[in-house]
Curated annotation (Swiss-Prot):
Organism: Brucella suis biovar 1 (strain 1330)
Organism taxonomic ancestry: Bacteria, Pseudomonadati, Pseudomonadota, Alphaproteobacteria, Hyphomicrobiales
Record entry for activity regulation: Inhibited by iodoacetate, iodoacetamide and by high amounts (10 mM) of pyrrole-2-carboxylic acid (PYC). Not inhibited by PYC at 1 mM.
Binding-site residues, substrate: 91-92, 223, 249, 254-255
Entry's family note: Belongs to the proline racemase family.
Remarks, miscellaneous: This enzyme does not require pyridoxal phosphate (PLP) as a cofactor.
Pfam families in alphabetical order: Pro_racemase
Subunit structure and binding partners: Homodimer.
UniProt superkingdom: Bacteria
NCBIfam families assigned to the protein according to its UniProt record, in alphabetical order: PRK13971.1 (NF010578)
EC number(s) recorded for this UniProt protein: 5.1.1.8
Protein name in the entry: 4-hydroxyproline 2-epimerase
Length: 333
Protein backbone atom coordinates (compact mmCIF):
# COMPACT_ATOMS: atom_id res chain seq x y z
CA UNK A 1 0.00 0.00 0.00
CA UNK A 2 1.23 3.49 -0.82
CA UNK A 3 0.16 7.08 -0.44
CA UNK A 4 1.09 9.21 -3.45
CA UNK A 5 1.43 12.94 -2.84
CA UNK A 6 0.92 15.69 -5.42
CA UNK A 7 1.59 19.37 -4.80
CA UNK A 8 -0.78 21.43 -6.91
CA UNK A 9 -1.32 25.11 -7.64
CA UNK A 10 -5.01 25.72 -8.29
CA UNK A 11 -6.51 28.54 -10.31
CA UNK A 12 -8.90 29.37 -13.12
CA UNK A 13 -8.75 30.89 -16.59
CA UNK A 14 -11.69 33.21 -17.25
CA UNK A 15 -13.78 30.99 -14.96
CA UNK A 16 -12.65 27.50 -16.00
CA UNK A 17 -10.48 25.58 -13.50
CA UNK A 18 -6.80 24.77 -13.92
CA UNK A 19 -4.89 22.50 -11.53
CA UNK A 20 -1.14 22.75 -12.14
CA UNK A 21 0.71 19.72 -10.76
CA UNK A 22 3.96 21.27 -9.54
CA UNK A 23 5.26 18.20 -7.69
CA UNK A 24 4.71 14.46 -7.79
CA UNK A 25 4.29 13.94 -11.52
CA UNK A 26 5.78 10.71 -12.94
CA UNK A 27 8.91 10.42 -15.06
CA UNK A 28 7.88 9.63 -18.63
CA UNK A 29 9.65 7.89 -21.49
CA UNK A 30 9.65 9.29 -25.02
CA UNK A 31 11.56 11.59 -27.33
CA UNK A 32 8.52 13.83 -27.98
CA UNK A 33 5.65 15.06 -25.84
CA UNK A 34 3.25 12.96 -27.92
CA UNK A 35 5.29 9.86 -26.99
CA UNK A 36 5.39 10.92 -23.33
CA UNK A 37 1.62 11.44 -23.46
CA UNK A 38 1.22 7.86 -24.71
CA UNK A 39 3.41 6.55 -21.85
CA UNK A 40 1.38 8.52 -19.31
CA UNK A 41 -1.91 7.15 -20.67
CA UNK A 42 -0.57 3.59 -20.66
CA UNK A 43 0.85 3.54 -17.11
CA UNK A 44 -0.18 6.62 -15.14
CA UNK A 45 -3.71 7.51 -16.18
CA UNK A 46 -4.76 6.79 -12.58
CA UNK A 47 -3.04 10.06 -11.66
CA UNK A 48 -5.26 11.95 -14.09
CA UNK A 49 -8.46 10.28 -12.91
CA UNK A 50 -7.46 10.62 -9.26
CA UNK A 51 -6.72 14.34 -9.51
CA UNK A 52 -9.44 15.35 -11.97
CA UNK A 53 -12.50 13.31 -10.95
CA UNK A 54 -14.40 13.33 -7.67
CA UNK A 55 -13.73 13.29 -4.76
CA UNK A 56 -10.57 15.38 -5.42
CA UNK A 57 -11.87 17.10 -8.54
CA UNK A 58 -15.14 17.52 -10.40
CA UNK A 59 -16.73 17.28 -13.85
CA UNK A 60 -15.13 20.50 -15.13
CA UNK A 61 -11.66 19.94 -13.67
CA UNK A 62 -8.71 20.50 -15.97
CA UNK A 63 -5.01 20.47 -15.24
CA UNK A 64 -1.44 20.17 -16.40
CA UNK A 65 1.94 18.71 -15.46
CA UNK A 66 5.24 20.43 -16.27
CA UNK A 67 8.22 18.57 -17.79
CA UNK A 68 11.61 19.46 -19.24
CA UNK A 69 11.23 20.21 -22.96
CA UNK A 70 11.95 17.51 -25.53
CA UNK A 71 13.00 20.07 -28.15
CA UNK A 72 15.73 22.74 -27.96
CA UNK A 73 13.51 25.65 -29.05
CA UNK A 74 11.22 25.36 -26.01
CA UNK A 75 11.48 26.55 -22.40
CA UNK A 76 9.23 23.93 -20.82
CA UNK A 77 6.95 21.04 -21.78
CA UNK A 78 3.33 20.66 -20.71
CA UNK A 79 1.15 17.57 -20.45
CA UNK A 80 -2.55 18.46 -20.28
CA UNK A 81 -4.85 16.35 -18.12
CA UNK A 82 -8.60 16.67 -17.64
CA UNK A 83 -11.73 14.62 -17.15
CA UNK A 84 -11.88 13.76 -20.87
CA UNK A 85 -8.30 12.46 -21.04
CA UNK A 86 -4.95 13.94 -22.05
CA UNK A 87 -5.68 16.57 -24.66
CA UNK A 88 -2.93 17.29 -27.22
CA UNK A 89 -3.47 21.00 -26.56
CA UNK A 90 -5.61 23.09 -24.21
CA UNK A 91 -5.93 26.86 -24.63
CA UNK A 92 -7.43 27.83 -21.29
CA UNK A 93 -5.09 25.32 -19.63
CA UNK A 94 -2.12 26.98 -21.30
CA UNK A 95 -3.12 30.46 -20.11
CA UNK A 96 -3.63 29.23 -16.55
CA UNK A 97 -0.49 27.09 -16.52
CA UNK A 98 1.72 29.91 -17.80
CA UNK A 99 0.23 32.43 -15.37
CA UNK A 100 0.76 30.25 -12.30
CA UNK A 101 4.13 28.85 -13.41
CA UNK A 102 5.56 32.36 -13.92
CA UNK A 103 4.05 33.79 -10.72
CA UNK A 104 5.30 30.84 -8.65
CA UNK A 105 8.77 30.78 -10.21
CA UNK A 106 8.33 27.28 -11.63
CA UNK A 107 9.64 28.37 -15.03
CA UNK A 108 12.44 30.76 -15.90
CA UNK A 109 11.96 32.06 -19.45
CA UNK A 110 15.03 32.55 -21.63
CA UNK A 111 13.50 35.86 -22.69
CA UNK A 112 11.34 37.73 -20.13
CA UNK A 113 7.79 38.12 -21.40
CA UNK A 114 8.11 35.20 -23.81
CA UNK A 115 7.87 31.45 -23.44
CA UNK A 116 7.89 28.53 -25.86
CA UNK A 117 5.84 25.52 -24.75
CA UNK A 118 6.48 21.97 -25.92
CA UNK A 119 3.03 20.34 -26.12
CA UNK A 120 1.82 17.06 -27.65
CA UNK A 121 0.24 19.11 -30.45
CA UNK A 122 3.49 20.99 -31.18
CA UNK A 123 5.24 24.23 -30.26
CA UNK A 124 3.03 26.91 -28.71
CA UNK A 125 4.57 30.38 -28.50
CA UNK A 126 3.61 32.55 -25.52
CA UNK A 127 3.77 36.27 -24.80
CA UNK A 128 2.74 37.45 -21.35
CA UNK A 129 2.31 40.80 -19.62
CA UNK A 130 3.52 41.00 -16.03
CA UNK A 131 2.84 43.70 -13.43
CA UNK A 132 5.25 43.08 -10.57
CA UNK A 133 4.70 39.55 -9.33
CA UNK A 134 1.43 39.07 -11.19
CA UNK A 135 0.81 37.97 -14.78
CA UNK A 136 -2.04 40.09 -16.10
CA UNK A 137 -2.50 38.64 -19.58
CA UNK A 138 -1.23 35.74 -21.68
CA UNK A 139 -1.34 35.48 -25.46
CA UNK A 140 -0.63 32.10 -27.00
CA UNK A 141 0.14 31.53 -30.66
CA UNK A 142 -1.47 28.19 -31.28
CA UNK A 143 -0.68 25.34 -33.62
CA UNK A 144 -2.07 25.69 -37.18
CA UNK A 145 -5.86 25.43 -37.27
CA UNK A 146 -7.99 24.40 -40.23
CA UNK A 147 -11.51 23.60 -41.39
CA UNK A 148 -11.71 19.81 -41.70
CA UNK A 149 -15.23 19.19 -43.04
CA UNK A 150 -18.45 21.08 -43.79
CA UNK A 151 -22.10 20.17 -43.51
CA UNK A 152 -21.81 16.81 -41.76
CA UNK A 153 -25.27 15.63 -40.68
CA UNK A 154 -26.43 13.41 -37.84
CA UNK A 155 -29.59 13.03 -35.78
CA UNK A 156 -29.61 14.95 -32.49
CA UNK A 157 -31.97 13.99 -29.64
CA UNK A 158 -35.02 16.31 -29.38
CA UNK A 159 -33.74 18.58 -32.17
CA UNK A 160 -33.72 16.23 -35.16
CA UNK A 161 -31.21 16.36 -38.04
CA UNK A 162 -28.30 18.71 -37.28
CA UNK A 163 -25.54 19.84 -39.64
CA UNK A 164 -22.10 20.72 -38.30
CA UNK A 165 -18.78 21.94 -39.59
CA UNK A 166 -15.72 20.28 -38.07
CA UNK A 167 -12.55 22.30 -37.51
CA UNK A 168 -9.25 21.63 -35.79
CA UNK A 169 -7.69 24.08 -33.35
CA UNK A 170 -5.58 21.71 -31.26
CA UNK A 171 -8.53 19.31 -30.93
CA UNK A 172 -11.35 18.50 -33.35
CA UNK A 173 -14.55 20.52 -32.82
CA UNK A 174 -18.04 20.04 -34.23
CA UNK A 175 -19.38 23.57 -34.68
CA UNK A 176 -23.17 23.90 -34.46
CA UNK A 177 -24.45 27.13 -36.03
CA UNK A 178 -28.06 28.41 -36.29
CA UNK A 179 -30.12 26.29 -38.70
CA UNK A 180 -33.61 24.87 -39.11
CA UNK A 181 -33.47 22.66 -36.00
CA UNK A 182 -31.14 24.81 -33.87
CA UNK A 183 -31.59 28.52 -33.20
CA UNK A 184 -29.11 29.86 -30.63
CA UNK A 185 -27.37 28.48 -27.54
CA UNK A 186 -29.34 30.98 -25.46
CA UNK A 187 -32.59 29.22 -26.38
CA UNK A 188 -31.56 26.04 -24.58
CA UNK A 189 -30.42 25.28 -21.06
CA UNK A 190 -26.91 24.13 -20.23
CA UNK A 191 -28.44 20.83 -19.09
CA UNK A 192 -29.98 20.32 -22.53
CA UNK A 193 -26.66 21.01 -24.28
CA UNK A 194 -24.92 18.62 -21.88
CA UNK A 195 -27.52 15.92 -22.58
CA UNK A 196 -27.33 16.25 -26.37
CA UNK A 197 -23.59 16.72 -26.83
CA UNK A 198 -22.24 13.23 -26.03
CA UNK A 199 -24.85 11.63 -28.30
CA UNK A 200 -24.01 14.06 -31.10
CA UNK A 201 -20.28 13.40 -30.64
CA UNK A 202 -20.73 9.63 -30.60
CA UNK A 203 -22.87 9.63 -33.74
CA UNK A 204 -20.41 11.86 -35.59
CA UNK A 205 -17.47 9.64 -34.61
CA UNK A 206 -19.39 6.54 -35.70
CA UNK A 207 -20.47 8.00 -39.05
CA UNK A 208 -17.37 9.98 -40.05
CA UNK A 209 -13.60 9.66 -39.74
CA UNK A 210 -11.59 12.44 -38.11
CA UNK A 211 -7.85 12.17 -38.62
CA UNK A 212 -5.23 14.90 -38.35
CA UNK A 213 -3.18 14.62 -41.56
CA UNK A 214 0.16 15.00 -39.76
CA UNK A 215 -0.49 13.70 -36.22
CA UNK A 216 -1.73 10.08 -36.28
CA UNK A 217 -2.64 10.06 -32.57
CA UNK A 218 -5.23 12.81 -33.10
CA UNK A 219 -7.98 10.71 -34.65
CA UNK A 220 -11.34 11.51 -33.08
CA UNK A 221 -13.79 14.32 -32.57
CA UNK A 222 -13.65 15.35 -28.91
CA UNK A 223 -15.59 18.62 -28.49
CA UNK A 224 -18.95 20.13 -29.46
CA UNK A 225 -19.11 23.93 -29.91
CA UNK A 226 -22.62 25.39 -29.73
CA UNK A 227 -22.75 28.94 -31.12
CA UNK A 228 -24.87 31.96 -30.31
CA UNK A 229 -25.21 35.71 -30.61
CA UNK A 230 -22.94 37.66 -28.23
CA UNK A 231 -24.23 39.46 -25.16
CA UNK A 232 -21.03 41.34 -24.34
CA UNK A 233 -20.74 44.57 -26.38
CA UNK A 234 -17.15 43.79 -27.42
CA UNK A 235 -17.74 40.19 -28.49
CA UNK A 236 -18.20 38.96 -32.05
CA UNK A 237 -19.74 35.61 -31.08
CA UNK A 238 -20.65 33.48 -28.09
CA UNK A 239 -20.16 29.77 -27.48
CA UNK A 240 -20.76 26.87 -25.14
CA UNK A 241 -18.09 24.19 -25.57
CA UNK A 242 -18.89 20.67 -24.40
CA UNK A 243 -16.04 18.36 -23.39
CA UNK A 244 -15.56 15.21 -21.35
CA UNK A 245 -18.75 13.40 -20.32
CA UNK A 246 -20.82 16.30 -18.98
CA UNK A 247 -18.82 19.53 -18.88
CA UNK A 248 -19.44 22.94 -20.42
CA UNK A 249 -16.33 25.12 -20.59
CA UNK A 250 -16.71 28.21 -18.43
CA UNK A 251 -14.05 30.01 -20.47
CA UNK A 252 -14.48 30.81 -24.18
CA UNK A 253 -12.17 27.81 -24.87
CA UNK A 254 -8.81 28.49 -26.51
CA UNK A 255 -8.60 25.58 -28.93
CA UNK A 256 -12.31 26.00 -29.64
CA UNK A 257 -11.80 29.67 -30.45
CA UNK A 258 -8.91 28.66 -32.71
CA UNK A 259 -11.13 26.14 -34.50
CA UNK A 260 -13.92 28.70 -34.87
CA UNK A 261 -11.52 31.24 -36.39
CA UNK A 262 -10.23 28.60 -38.80
CA UNK A 263 -13.80 27.83 -39.87
CA UNK A 264 -14.63 31.51 -40.39
CA UNK A 265 -11.35 32.15 -42.24
CA UNK A 266 -11.99 29.22 -44.59
CA UNK A 267 -15.37 30.78 -45.44
CA UNK A 268 -13.85 34.20 -46.12
CA UNK A 269 -15.21 35.82 -42.96
CA UNK A 270 -11.80 36.39 -41.33
CA UNK A 271 -8.43 37.23 -42.84
CA UNK A 272 -4.88 37.60 -41.47
CA UNK A 273 -4.74 40.45 -38.98
CA UNK A 274 -8.43 40.28 -38.08
CA UNK A 275 -9.47 40.04 -34.45
CA UNK A 276 -12.19 37.75 -33.15
CA UNK A 277 -13.46 38.28 -29.61
CA UNK A 278 -15.19 35.19 -28.26
CA UNK A 279 -17.61 35.19 -25.31
CA UNK A 280 -18.13 32.24 -22.97
CA UNK A 281 -21.33 30.95 -21.42
CA UNK A 282 -20.58 33.04 -18.29
CA UNK A 283 -19.60 36.20 -20.20
CA UNK A 284 -15.79 36.04 -20.01
CA UNK A 285 -13.81 36.89 -23.15
CA UNK A 286 -10.88 35.57 -25.16
CA UNK A 287 -9.29 37.91 -27.68
CA UNK A 288 -8.46 35.90 -30.79
CA UNK A 289 -6.47 37.03 -33.81
CA UNK A 290 -5.62 35.47 -37.16
CA UNK A 291 -1.84 35.85 -37.19
CA UNK A 292 -1.17 34.52 -40.68
CA UNK A 293 -2.20 32.03 -43.32
CA UNK A 294 -0.67 28.55 -43.20
CA UNK A 295 -0.98 25.08 -44.67
CA UNK A 296 -1.36 21.64 -43.09
CA UNK A 297 -0.63 18.73 -45.44
CA UNK A 298 -1.93 20.74 -48.37
CA UNK A 299 -5.00 22.04 -46.52
CA UNK A 300 -5.49 25.81 -46.16
CA UNK A 301 -5.00 26.76 -42.52
CA UNK A 302 -4.38 29.70 -40.23
CA UNK A 303 -2.06 30.36 -37.32
CA UNK A 304 -4.36 31.74 -34.59
CA UNK A 305 -3.49 33.49 -31.35
CA UNK A 306 -5.61 33.73 -28.21
CA UNK A 307 -5.29 36.17 -25.31
CA UNK A 308 -6.87 35.83 -21.88
CA UNK A 309 -6.23 36.04 -18.15
CA UNK A 310 -6.02 33.64 -15.21
CA UNK A 311 -5.97 33.90 -11.43
CA UNK A 312 -4.44 31.62 -8.83
CA UNK A 313 -6.83 30.45 -6.10
CA UNK A 314 -4.55 28.51 -3.77
CA UNK A 315 -2.17 25.66 -2.98
CA UNK A 316 -3.30 22.09 -2.65
CA UNK A 317 -1.40 18.99 -1.50
CA UNK A 318 -3.45 16.03 -2.68
CA UNK A 319 -3.06 12.40 -1.62
CA UNK A 320 -3.98 9.39 -3.72
CA UNK A 321 -3.97 6.62 -1.13
CA UNK A 322 -4.10 2.98 -2.23
CA UNK A 323 -6.24 2.21 0.85
CA UNK A 324 -8.94 4.54 -0.48
CA UNK A 325 -11.60 2.64 -2.49
CA UNK A 326 -12.01 5.84 -4.54
CA UNK A 327 -8.28 6.41 -5.00
CA UNK A 328 -8.62 6.67 -8.77
CA UNK A 329 -11.70 8.86 -8.68
CA UNK A 330 -15.26 8.43 -9.87
CA UNK A 331 -17.88 10.20 -11.93
CA UNK A 332 -21.63 10.09 -11.32
CA UNK A 333 -23.59 9.84 -14.57
Amino acid sequence: MARHSFFCVDGHTCGNPVRLVAGGGPNLNGSTMMEKRAHFLAEYDWIRTGLMFEPRGHDMMSGSILYPPTRPDCDVAVLFIETSGCLPMCGHGTIGTVTMAIEQGLVTPKTPGKLNLDTPAGLVAIEYEQDGQYVERVRLTNVPAFLYAEGLEVECPDLGPIKVDVAYGGNFYAIVEPQENYTDMDDYSALQLIAWSPVLRQRLNEKYKFQHPELPDINRLSHILWTGKPKHPQAHARNAVFYGDKAIDRSPCGTGTSARMAQLAAKGKLKPGDEFIHESIIGSLFHGRVERAAEVAGRPAIVPSIAGWARMTGYNTIFIDDRDPFAHGFSVA
